[in-house]
Amino acid sequence: MAAQRRRKGGEVESDYIKYLKYKNTGFQVSASDKTLAWWPTKDADRAFCHVEVTKDDGKNFTVRLENGEEKSQPKNEKNFLGVNPPKFDGVEDMGELGYLNEPAVLHNLKKRYDADLFHTYSGLFLVVVNPYKRLPVYTPEIIDIYRGRQRDKVAPHIFAISDAAYRAMLNTRQNQSMLITGESGAGKTENTKKVIQYLTAIAGRAEGGLLEQQLLEFNPILEAFGNAKTTKNNNSSRFGKFIELQFNAGGQITGANTFIYLLEKSRVTAQGAGERNFHIFYQILSKAMPEELKQKLKLTKPEDYFFLNQNACYTVDDMDDAKEFDHMLKAFDILNINEEERLAIFQTISAILHLGNLPFIDVNSETAGLKDEVELNIAAELLGVSAAGLKAGLLSPRIKAGNEWVTRALNKPKAMASRDALCKALFGRLFLWIVQKINRILSHKDKTALWIGVLDISGFEIFQHNSFEQLCINYTNEKLQQFFNHHMFTLEQQEYEREKIDWTFVDYGMDSQDCIDLIEKKPMGILPLLDEQTVFPDADDTSFTKKLFQTHENHRNFRRPRFDANNFKIVHYAGEVEYQTSAWLEKNRDPLEDDLSNLCKKSSVRFVTGLFDEDLMPSFKAAPAEEEKAAAGGSRNRSTGRGKGGAQFITVAFQYKEQLAHLMSMLSSTAPHFIRCIIPNLGKKPGVVSDQLVLDQLKCNGVLEGIRIARKGWPNRLKYDEFLKRYFLLKPGATPTSPSTKDAVKDLIEHLIAKEPTKVNKDEVRFGVTKIFFRSGQLAAIEELREQAISKMVVSIQAGARAFLARRMYDKMREQTVSAKILQRNIRAWLELKNWAWYQLYVKARPLISQRNFQKEIDDLKKQVKDLEKELAALKDANAKLDKEKQLAEEDADKLEKDLAALKLKILDLEGEKADLEEDNALLQKKVAGLEEELQEETSASNDILEQKRKLEAEKGELKASLEEEERNRKALQEAKTKVESERNELQDKYEDEAAAHDSLKKKEEDLSRELRETKDALADAENISETLRSKLKNTERGADDVRNELDDVTATKLQLEKTKKSLEEELAQTRAQLEEEKSGKEAASSKAKQLGQQLEDARSEVDSLKSKLSAAEKSLKTAKDQNRDLDEQLEDERTVRANVDKQKKALEAKLTELEDQVTALDGQKNAAAAQAKTLKTQVDETKRRLEEAEASAARLEKERKNALDEVAQLTADLDAERDSGAQQRRKLNTRISELQSELENAPKTGGASSEEVKRLEGELERLEEELLTAQEARAAAEKNLDKANLELEELRQEADDAARDNDKLVKDNRKLKADLDEARIQLEEEQDAKSHADSSSRRLLAEIEELKKRVAKETSDKQKAQDQKANYQRENESLKADRDSIERRNRDAERQVRDLRAQLDDALSRLDSEKRAKEKSVEANRELKKVVLDRERQSLESLSKFNSALESDKQILEDEIGDLHEKNKQLQAKIAQLQDEIDGTPSSRGGSTRGASARGASVRAGSARAEE
């Protein structure tokens, strides 16, 4: 099971990466430095193409089109559409694009869509492109991935928006809304279902109860009755809905409530080409409907009904009506819709179908009739009404004229229209009843504390023919776009305020206000005018259109068409739309004959009676905000109705305005989230994108409008550390990290402005508190600079790599050349020896040596063989004993090696564990650092909260003091008024005390003036403080939520650290156990374990520290909660105080007029104080400016110092590299010199060997001449080697020249880069030094070659002085003595030859006699030599016919034994003595024997020389 879970988890992770994460191929170096731009095309498949910008002077730019044509245009945001660098391909949030324009947005969407990624953020938007195929991105495992994750931590997804809304609702305790808009077929309904699926999964009960099933299953019922096939969508929702998902205080889902808008009832009676009626009509006619029920309802097949067979479209691809009907019945069961209600629903649907088949005929031009009444009777029976009454209501309805009812005959078209109105009313009210039923089952208002609303409504519609329905939809989207603009850019500008970015607040929410007023504003808006014309008896569509032209001719959003006088145009935010006013008044009235309405109210079927109950419809008498939430918002073509206050005519326009006002009121009370759905193509093909279609939808959905407004702000932003880490390489000497990232980023931007003023503009950059902000396109320009810098780096790296590969190939070729020359030299030496006359003479003379007493020698040899056999047996015994001992020693060695290997493995394991612990420790340190930063931020946030609390307490105290002071002032003011009057009387009576009284009065008047001013300020401050307290309370609540979230993160980190701690303790215990077992001889491992233990203790101390910080965070959270409660109490007190202040305000305002004259005197003082404050502010600004200049100067000096240090480091590194290069070249030259010396030394050795082998032979003079010739040839070879060395020296010089040329080329290519030029000069100087070193090495080589020449001359003279054979033997003995040490060293290798000697045992027995006489330490070598001599003698005795084969065999044997013979001094001496005895004892054959011995000696020495070579 665990394996299955792991495998399943891996598959889920794979699906997440494959279908939700963009697979970036990494950095790609641009092929060129061309500047590209987007250019509009006339191609139907491509809206834009890439063009090259050939000229750009800042004001105008020139581009080269694909056909080679060049065009110039002024450079502005409209004309110049920049192409983003590859780094921005496939970004998850299009708000991050460097160039924010239409083609850039389209290109990014296409990139992601091609990779099966159809979710993309665009600022606050989530853009969802319909994939037209099933992908595994909505599974329960994917839900678990997004559960509780922040939006920026996971890939874009509808689940991420849903989770963000849910978490925001719980944290802020504010209702949320999710606005899903788009054209039909874009996927609005599917995304709505995914939102419900996600919220039900994360907020429902773990085991999944009935309510969760009901929430998931009520949608199929709405789809059956409200969805239909259209040309764009097989399951198009023909109504808008707002689903209110309800939650309790704990965040558990408790129910749902649905509001509907704009039901397309006209589809019941007529459909467009290739479209169907609502699904329910086909489902009840499918094979899933029981046959007995079909017979009861008189149903047959779709082809038999007029409302279904108008377009002969009865089926839908990939949809089985029978299965969908079964699914709907299952949903009925889950929602507890009983059999009686189901039957009533099916009866109503069947009655509509039968009413559609009524056979109307013309009785005359003014009267219609029925051909037969079969269908009429069936419909009347199903509706529970009389057939006669139904017929009269359809053909001759009654109207009220005064106090009398008058019957009015209808012709065929009007009778059919009356029938259609009845069918639409029946279906519309049936749909309302179903929605109300679902709401009664799902809604639990008594348990509801919060809710999330999901709005599924059509986006902006611009068709070829636009009517009243399109105006209502576009009017809705104007309101929603205004709502979005206000919300989006209020948040955006709050971000600027937090980051202290200079910004003038702009209310973008008013951009659509003119268009909205044109449509809705009373009394002359389009909809009020339509209502006015609707109630006029003589009004028609033409009079309505004329009224529009008269009223709005000069309105900036209203246009008059050039051709059609019955149409008008409105300029919406998404574009200009032309509306046809045909049948607008009729649609606004949506008439239903009173006779038919009353007939249905009196139906015998209770269900039908309930459909026409006025309580089914919402009342519009009161304002929407005052109304209780209606179960449904109405329909697209709402019929007239009666208000509860009496007869009241309600138009569709009025009704819809009220519904929309109610919707906007609900949305305004929520925090909204926006999802925009897009159709990629009209063919419903996966992987295909129609550029113009997508652009039109982006425009209609407000995405491009949002981008337009975003250009006015600072859409691109990065944190300082992120920006520095990515772009530090654009400034020499900059590092990816800095203690002050903001200052480092400022320096980097200043450097870019100075270096690239045409690409980086200081007016396009703003520095915030924690982030750097850019205008649209500025960040893309910086990214281009970065790519250019990386391109140069990559080119340099490639050049270095190619140079390294070329040098390695050159070295390999040179080694191959040297090896080939050595082989050629050895082959030439062998051929020279083979063709040497003396060697040929030796080969021919060898078989002619005189015979000796071989029988005696054979007997002696046999005797020696027996003795040697005994010795061999003894040696075998000794060898066997040694073999046993060796085997035991090998076994012990193997055991020791195994133990050593095991010990090494354990040590490696311990080292690996140490490395793992070190990594864990590093991770812990990083986590601790992150937690410390979070705790610091939390502490600062807590401090801010405390500071706000203190300020609020101070303000509260001041407010209370102000109020108390105000009360005292009021009383004092009344008393002062009385005193002033009494004093005035006293002044009139007592004129003599005028001076003293005047001073007292003046002082009191000043007091009164001050009190008046303070009173006015108190009144203003009271209002300001009230608003401030509210905003601060909200901010405090948000801060508390943030602290709560941070506390959750810290708690999770704590749990993770505890797990890590436990894991470390277990690993430490294991390590200690291993160390105890191998304590002996493993002190190093023990010390490592101690170090790991120390690290664990450090980790524990860090965990304890984190625990203390966590407790501090919990305390701060508790403090924040207490502050929140205090603020609530303060707000309540403030409300009470404000009520008192309002009461006092009215009394004080009466007194203001009396004291205004006294306030005038204080204005002068206020102006003086303001002037003084301005002066102080100027001084402060000057001081700040000087301080900033000083800081900038210090930073500049520090930067120069760093640059100097970097240059010194670079120079040092270059110098070391050149030194290493020179040393390498010197080693190569020394190696070459050694080769030359060995070659020169081999030449004299060969010559010396030749001269010693031909002593006492005839033609000694010719031999000496031959040796001289050989020496001369060796000298020529040495001179040839000297020429080769000179050639190599010339090659080195050529390489130096090539390097100089490369440097010159590098200087030419990079003349603008001073640093590269300096490096090239330094490299050239170093190579010149290397060249001088090479020259000196060459001179030393020439000197050594001269020395070698002298040695050759000296050895040649020595050879010429050699006159007798004795001297030659003595020199040979001296040479052999010099080789004795080498022989002794090689004897130690005899043990390795034991196995070979055993295989050659028979051959060794024949060599024992010869090796015993020699008495050499190397018994094996002497035995081999004797065996060679014995074989040689036996071959001579056997047959002369085998002469050639014997010679070849001897030659091979001699060649094999040359190396060994060269190393055996005593054996050669014995052989020389033996040959001398043979020469002395056999006079008759002395010449032949001597020549044979000399020849064999020459062969031995020649073979030795070749072996050395």
From Swiss-Prot:
Domain Myosin motor: 89-787
GO-annotated biological processes: actin filament organization
Compositional bias per record (Polar residues), positions renumbered to this chain: 1231-1240
Domain Myosin N-terminal SH3-like per the UniProt entry, residue ranges: 32-85
Entries under InterPro entries matching the protein: IQ_motif_EF-hand-BS, Kinesin_motor_dom_sf, Myosin_head_motor_dom-like, Myosin_N, P-loop_NTPase
Region (Nonhelical tailpiece): 1483-1509
The name this protein goes by in its record: Myosin-2 heavy chain, non muscle
Taxonomic source organism: Acanthamoeba castellanii (Amoeba)
Lineage: Eukaryota, Amoebozoa, Discosea, Longamoebia, Centramoebida
